[in-house]
Amino acid sequence: MYIDAATLPSSAVLLDVDGTILDLAPTPLEVVVPPELTIALERLSKRTGGALAFVSGRPLAELDLFFQPLKLPSIAGHGAELRLNDGTVARANTFLDPQLKADLASIADDKPGVVVEDKNYSVAIHYRQAPHLGHAVRDEVSAVCARFPSTAIEILPGKSVVEVKQPSFNKGTAVRELMQHAPFKGRRPIFIGDDVTDEAAFAVLPEFNGVGFSVGREVQGIAGMFEQPSDVRRWIAEMVLTKKDAK
């Protein structure tokens, strides 16, 4: 619909996960990966010569768990982890202060429906099940982080979530690094993302003559927009459709 399948052999397809190819769920561990999506992703990887990668805020281990048996090249943890096509993994060597993580976790103690997710390199406070507490959660996250003035901290607001991480890495810096390695090098990246946390990746696309597509929200400079994750899944299926499948 948006990209001619004939361009796939010269493209690199980069996909955010939650809210982009998977529907959002009440909690991070409740997301559902349709079996047909895993099959389509495997085909898409072959169509692109292996130049298909996840670009996610989730830890690498979770991506592997949800999409098994696939182990695609991946940018995980908002750029803290980078797995290349040959399986090698580079990881950031900076971590959040343990006391900061503990204080952030305590935000949920008196807030039913608020879920704290420790992602190793970041902490996410989800309020999807308690949207009325969104303002309180955001205010408390800011207050907690203000108690650690000597610590480099980045606060990322998202869809019913606030994430706290080190500012030394993000999806954009990781995409830039990924594009230096085979089979991504020299290809035109196609990135699809849905949230504020994806904007760093959108920002580096012009460096590689890339194109970006958002899901459910307008983003400056993008080439187009999908309404919802099911539309992205449908697009992926169409990109890998063979003549035999069409019969």
Write out the residue ranges for each language-model feature.
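Mg2+-dependent phosphoryl-transfer enzymes with acidic/Ser/Thr/Gly-rich catalytic loops
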Residues: L8, P34, G172-K247
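Substrate-recognition/cap helix-loop segment adjacent to the acidic, metal-dependent catalytic center
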Residues: R58-G77, L133-I153
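Residue-level signal for inorganic ion chemistry
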Residues: G19, S74, I125, V175, ...
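Substrate-recognition "cap/lid" segment bordering the active-site pocket of phosphatases
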Residues: G77-D103, L156-G186
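Charged, glycine-interspersed solvent-exposed loop segments at helix/strand-loop junctions
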Residues: V114-H132, A152-K165
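The start of beta-strands in P-loop NTPase/AAA+ ATPase cores
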Residues: S11-V13, D18, A51, L72, ...
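Active-site phosphate-binding/coordination module
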Residues: V32-K119
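Non-catalytic pre-domain segments flanking phosphatase-related domains
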Residues: M1-V17, I21-A25, L29, E36, ...
